[in-house]
């Protein structure tokens, strides 16, 4: 039996530093819209034009960020242009989180996380968009997940970075309330995004985002968004039972790529989410030497993974890319017979836990297996 080979990706350069940090927050060739919904006005930024019947890539940022600070470093990355030439991009800013947003009036009731998800259908209708491939980070990943659960016909695929499918426990809630009395909101947000190792080691990145959160985001509005996220409900998703009709289980129906850095505070939450999703259409990407913002510090790896993801959905089949080191984790009940790919691959078995790992051609998607990727 062949030995499993790992191939390392060469692009591991952080995008943010003192010279180009500001540039990577900038928008290029964009159109901005303020769209009225039943739950308030939402700010949307469009890059490019929709391509025929193709879905639009729709992004949703995390707390303490907006679309610029969360995604522009990723979408301005050179290799991403191979993707954006085939897809329009729609960036959604949560209410009051966009650059230069005024404070909400006293007594304003900020939308719940469920209501934020329900603001998206009017956005698609207003822009005449038929379907999306969503990319969400943290709170944005939760919102897009809720949107996909409520409107599966509008979502073709999801890339969920640092997603937490669980409601905030009462102990966590009490701790956050207590910390809020002694800690400013900027420190709370930084602890949400970055682990202790990254907070101490990546000082330039932390300082860039500390200044952005404190100076570019309306602090009153940020507190409202943070409170909404802390009050989220459990997504109540569950892994389908083998042999059961998928329509009887509450789970994401679309192709889903879960992403988390190995030093991220969200690792446990993402692993929990993976355990609840359908292994047939879910991939878990764990990024080595990476913290809470993989789209910023490891754009090359994430871009390549996103290309594979789109290829698996039948888009951009001619995209040029290097080989990605991958390993699959199979359940013992999975069959390698009828679902076996015609492409060659090597498989190694772990007798102690009954799992198998494989390395295969990047354009192969075995729909009967759960895939776990490490890079």
Curated annotation (Swiss-Prot):
Organism expressing this protein natively: Homo sapiens
Region described as Disordered: 326-375
Tissues showing expression: Ubiquitous. Highly expressed in brain.
Gene Ontology BP terms: cell differentiation; negative regulation of cell growth; signal transduction; spermatogenesis
UniProt xrefs under Gene3D superfamilies: alpha/beta hydrolase
Positions bearing N-acetylmethionine: 1
Pfam assignment, any one: Ndr
Basic and acidic residues composition bias: residue spans: 364-375
This protein's UniProt keywords: Acetylation, Phosphoprotein
Family: Belongs to the NDRG family.
InterPro entries reported in the protein's UniProt record: AB_hydrolase_fold, NDRG
GO terms for cellular component: cytoplasm; extracellular exosome
Superkingdom of the organism of origin: Eukaryota
Residue ranges with Polar residues bias: 347-359
Protein name: Protein NDRG3
Gene name per UniProt: NDRG3
Residue numbers carrying Phosphothreonine: 322, 329, 332, 355
Phosphoserine modification, residue list: 331, 334-335, 338, 341, 352, 361, 374
Record's compositionally biased regions (Low complexity): 330-346
């Amino acid at each position: 039996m062949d030995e499993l080979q790992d191939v390392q990706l060469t692009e591991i350069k952080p995008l943010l530093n003192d010279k180009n940090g500001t540039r990577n927050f900038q928008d290029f060739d964009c159109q901005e819209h303020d769209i009225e919904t039943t739950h308030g006005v939402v700010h949307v930024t469009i890059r490019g034009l929709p391509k025929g019947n193709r879905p639009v890539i729709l992004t949703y940022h995390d707390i303490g960020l907006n679309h610029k600070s969360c995604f522009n470093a990723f979408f301005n990355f050179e290799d991403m242009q191979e993707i954006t030439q085939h897809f329009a991009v729609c960036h959604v800013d949560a209410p009051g989180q966009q650059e230069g947003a005024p404070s909400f009036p006293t007594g304003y009731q900020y939308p719940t996380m469920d209501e934020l998800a329900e603001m998206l259908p009017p956005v698609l209708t207003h822009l005449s968009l038929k379907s999306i491939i969503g990319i969400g980070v943290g709170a944005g990943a939760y919102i897009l997940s809720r949107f996909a659960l409520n409107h599966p016909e509008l979502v073709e695929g999801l890339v969920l970075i640092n997603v937490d499918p669980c409601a905030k426990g009462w102990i966590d809630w009490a701790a956050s309330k207590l910390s809020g009395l002694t800690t400013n909101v900027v420190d709370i947000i930084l602890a949400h995004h970055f682990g202790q190792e990254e907070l101490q080691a990546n000082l330039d990145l932390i300082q860039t985002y500390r200044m952005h959160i404190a100076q570019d985001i309306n602090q009153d509005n940020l507190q409202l968004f943070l409170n909404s996220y802390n009050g989220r409900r459990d997504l109540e998703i569950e892994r389908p039972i083998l042999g059961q009709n998928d329509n009887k289980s509450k789970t994401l129906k679309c192709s889903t790529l879960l992403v988390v850095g190995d030093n991220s505070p969200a690792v446990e939450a993402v692993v929990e989410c993976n355990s609840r999703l359908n292994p047939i259409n879910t991939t878990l990407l764990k990024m080595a030497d990476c913290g809470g913002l993989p789209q910023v510090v490891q754009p090359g790896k994430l871009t390549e993974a996103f290309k594979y993801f789109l290829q698996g959905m039948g888009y951009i089949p001619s995209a040029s890319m290097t080989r990605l080191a991958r390993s699959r984790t199979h359940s013992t009940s999975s069959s390698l017979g009828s679902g076996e790919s015609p492409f060659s691959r090597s498989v190694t078995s772990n007798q102690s836990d009954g799992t198998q790992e494989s390395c295969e051609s990047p354009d192969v998607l075995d729909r009967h297996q759960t895939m776990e990727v490490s890079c």
